[in-house]
Amino acid sequence: MIIPHRADGGKNDVSAAELLKDERAARGWLTQAFAPSTEQWAQIERFVTMLIAENAKQNLIAASTIPAIWARHIADSAQLLALDTREGEGLWIDLGSGPGLPGLVVAILSERPMLLVESRRRRCDFLRAVVAELALDHVEVAEAPLERVATRPAATISARAFAPLDRLIDLSARFSTESTRWLLPKGRNAVKELALLPEPWQRMFHVEQSRTDAESGILVGTGRIAPKKRGKA
């Protein structure tokens, strides 16, 4: 199991008994953590149906994970929202959103304005189809590489599978403010990747245990990051 590291030295581990190991546990945790309305449950169910159908046309998620889609993808995404419980309506930017994980799950469970950044056309077509089908008026899809997305202050930045950690942070630093919350699932390499960051960046983050995988961690941080200085051309 990942051993979480906090800047304040406190514990934040998830016990083996609390891990969401199956679909029933995942649904139960979603109910307990977010108390979704009937409409939200219907939206999540519809999203799952659309995701599975689209996965037969383009590779959005590993086919082997479909039988456990509620634990492996829905609860796995929703746990990021549980790590940012601050009140308010600040912009949430989801980088490399792919099939909308975690962005669309977060958007269904909250009213936070959501920007899904994805450069691949077919994935963006799917994202737009889901947004329209579920009437998620607070969600915007940016079909472009991150480097071409206009700078906007983000209350939250997430990235489930986007780029190596140092590059991810450097590319997205311009969206950060003093209060930005960073939520970066990094799998089994979370502690190792954190240790490789520049010292000032390391101090901003700690590792939270994933609720869906005993070997995975989520980097959680708060604050503004200055982009790396570029050499002159």
UniProtKB/Swiss-Prot annotation:
Keyword annotations from UniProtKB, A to Z: Cytoplasm, Methyltransferase, rRNA processing, S-adenosyl-L-methionine, Transferase
Provide the catalytic activity annotation.
guanosine(527) in 16S rRNA + S-adenosyl-L-methionine = N(7)-methylguanosine(527) in 16S rRNA + S-adenosyl-L-homocysteine
Q: Which GO CC terms are listed, alphabetically? A: cytosol
Q: What is its EC number?
A: 2.1.1.170
Q: Where does S-adenosyl-L-methionine bind?
A: 96, 101, 146-147, 160
Q: Spell out the InterPro entries in the cross-references.
A: rRNA_ssu_MeTfrase_G (IPR003682), SAM-dependent_MTases_sf (IPR029063)
Q: Which GO terms describe its molecular function?
A: rRNA (guanine-N7-)-methyltransferase activity
Instruction: Name the coiled-coil region(s).
Output: none
In terms of superkingdom, the source organism counts as Bacteria
Give the enzyme class.
transferase
User: Where in or outside the cell is it found?
Assistant: Cytoplasm
Q: What does this protein do?
A: Specifically methylates the N7 position of guanine in position 527 of 16S rRNA.
Q: What name does this protein carry? A: Ribosomal RNA small subunit methyltransferase G
Q: Which organism is it from?
A: Sphingopyxis alaskensis (strain DSM 13593 / LMG 18877 / RB2256)
Q: Which gene encodes it?
A: rsmG
